[in-house]
Amino acid sequence: MTAANPQAGDGAKRPFDLVILDLDGTVQDLYHHAPISDAVKSAIAAVQAAGIPVTIATGRTLDYVRQHIAQLGITTPVVTTQGAVVGDPVSGKILSETTLPISLARQAAAWIDAQPYITAFYFNDDEEHIQIYQNRTGDDSEENVAFLDHVFGFPRAIHTPFSPMFAADDAHAPLKFVVVEDRERYHVDVLAELTERFSPTLTITRTHPRLVEGTAQDVDKGMGVLHLCELLGIDPQRVLAIGDSDNDIPMLKVVGLGVAMGNSTPGVIAAASYNAPSVAENGVAVALQDLILRHITA
């Protein structure tokens, strides 16, 4: 574990003004095989009790986050949908939203329609709830169904091909799309293929060992965190952020102190200033204790 010296805020009692945590692979194991640990819950509660707000930045949707973090007592606005949506986890109100331009959504849909990959587009409806459209289901094995339920979320409907969804002049713009990579079957690096085709007009990011996502240009967790800091009136340099996957790298780069989990990708470790233990070893709790709580209680 690599230590760092956080800047003191109010004396040495408030080393940071905000803590931002990734969800999957950071707060909770990647496939949710185990619940959020009591150690992590207690550390988050202690940081918030000390007057430092804690929030979440995730590729998951606002609806999903609201359902899964109530147990953490988080009320600060959250960064969701890969940075495309900042929302209130209590009321569900969307505070900021960035969608793909329809012209680029059409291009992405046309490309996806010509590919064999399982893919989903994500939209917020008029009532600010998420709607997910998936093009195919793949095999009907229990393992595959459980995987897609876990990574895509709900509610989902099958819509194939995608292109007709974007044909009308007033078509609804999507927040993002998610492509499931299957290298064993297709022997294709989807990240490289999508990046070559759509970058920089879209932001293409690997968010999971088997998932590649597309968002609007410059939309990522880093941009979402900057929007959140502006909304809260907080200097990003007074923020601590913890993550494990490549989509966390932009977030770690814009904050004062970036923390990599022990289960992080090499890119995350390179972008971070502090290395915590893995999610299985309660890395979030260890980092919060070392970087915040021990300074407050000293």
Language-model features, listed with the residues they occupy:
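Hydrophobic packing residues within well-ordered alpha-helices of enzyme cores
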Residues: 65-69, 194, 268, 284
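Short, structured coil segments at secondary-structure junctions
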Residues: 72-74, 81-82, 90, 198-200, ...
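Conserved acidic, metal-coordinating active-site core of Asp-based
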Residues: 111, 118, 122-242
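Active-site phosphate-binding/coordination module
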Residues: 38-145
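Short, acidic loop-to-helix structural element flanking the phosphoryl-transfer center
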Residues: 33-52, 97-104, 158-164, 218-230, ...
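A short, Lys/Arg-enriched amphipathic alpha-helix followed by its capping loop at the start of a domain
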Residues: 12-20, 39-52, 194, 198
